[in-house]
Each structure stands twice: as structure tokens, then as C-alpha cells.
Amino acid sequence: MTTVSMRDMLQAGVHFGHQTRYWNPKMKPFIFGARNGVHIINLEHTVPMFNEALAFISNVASKKGKVLFVGTKRAASEAIKEAAISCDQYYVDNRWLGGMLTNWKTVRQSIKRLKDLESQSVDGTFDKLTKKEALMRTRELEKLEKSLGGIKNMGGLPDVIFVIGADHEHIAIKEANNLGIPVVAVVDTNSSPDGINYIVPGNDDAMRAIRLYAESVAAAAKAGRGQDLAVQAEQDGFVEAE
């Protein structure tokens, strides 16, 4: 089972919150104190809460569930994308488009358009167009890929969303809440934990902390998927008796 230790979190700077004047009082239960005007997050809470979240994600993946990684802040986008790809899951790393979950029917049409354009770009269709038309379609393809590339193969709504930066991604969290999709989110001292099923109190700006969260969630999803594949293989009779 994937777990993260107190040492891992300390080394990554998970315990450093925001300046005290920007705090959200709802995060008080998770704050240890303050140092030099900066809130210090109590990792005695964060460690078990994050490990509980990882166990949940692993369980979702073990049932062929879809995990959607969400992190559109500059500090988070690259780590989110890499982690999602590494565990064969899905991501939104550029900008959360309103209705991405709650208006899935429309999003699905845009994904179909994206896939049509991808096909046209490789089957020679673009070559038969005028230079201007080909350029317009190329730009449309690039724009759609940037917005929807991480979810184009999701094939439906996710079973859980993992969010870096609760404040920044409040629209995604609200949409998930409306649809009853569980939310796992990293919540800094300046953010609200409302609407989050699995709260991970921690720094949501430091690159090392973000990579620790993202890579741990990816490892948990992979471990869960491995359990699923092992069960499937056993059912298919591929596992030899020792």
C-alpha cells in the first residue's frame, strides 16, 4: 500500500502554510502554530489524512475507477500532468472550463471534435485544404488539445477528483459536489476545506510538496490498478498455482 511518512512531508515543506494574515479560520484545527508570521501546518494531522486519501484512491482504481488530477496553477500543472500520465489516468492542467463535469454532454461533443481533427491531421485531410483553412483547423486542434487533451480518453465522468489548491480549483470542487463525485484536495491555510471529502492540509505552492502529493496519488492509483489486473488475471486463469 502506498503511504507517505512524516519525514517525506517535512523534507518537501508540506508544513509551511501561508502568512498568518491570509488564513482561513476553518483551517484552525489543522494549524500547529506560527513562525515568523507564517502558519505551520500540523503534520500529525496531515500524514494520516493523506494516507487515508491514498487508500481511498487505490481502492477506486482497484475497481477500474477513473481518477481525475486537477491542478491548473503554474506550480502544479506540470507535476499533475506527469503524474496522471504515469498511472494511466486523466488530468486538467491548463484551465478548468466551467461545466467540464456538470455539462459533460457538451464537453463530450468538443472531445469528439478534437479526435476528428486529430484524425484529419494525420490522414492527409489537412493537406487538401487551403493554407488558411488548414491553419485555422490546426489552431483549433491545438486549442482543444490544451483544454481537453488530458480527459479526451476518459470516456465519462471520473470516480474521484484529486485537486492541488482548493481555492484555485473551487469551480471543479463545486461541480464534483453537485454530481456526488468524491473530492481529495490539498488545502492550504488560506483556503476553505468545505466540500472536500478527503482533506489534505498542506502547502499547495512549493514544487517539492506538489510533486510529493501528485506522485503519491499516482503510485496509489497504480497499486490499485495492479490489484485489479491481478484479480483479472486470476479469473482468466493466467496465474499458475505454485
UniProtKB/Swiss-Prot annotation:
Alphabetized GO MF terms: structural constituent of ribosome
Pfam families named among the record's database cross-references: Ribosomal_S2 (PF00318)
Record carries keyword Ribonucleoprotein: yes
Signal peptide residues on this chain, from the entry's feature table: none
Gene Ontology cellular-component terms listed: cytosolic small ribosomal subunit
Keywords in alphabetical order: Ribonucleoprotein, Ribosomal protein
Coiled-coil region: none
GO process annotations (BP): translation
NCBIfam families xref list: rpsB_bact
Family: Belongs to the universal ribosomal protein uS2 family.
Entry protein name: Small ribosomal subunit protein uS2
Gene: rpsB
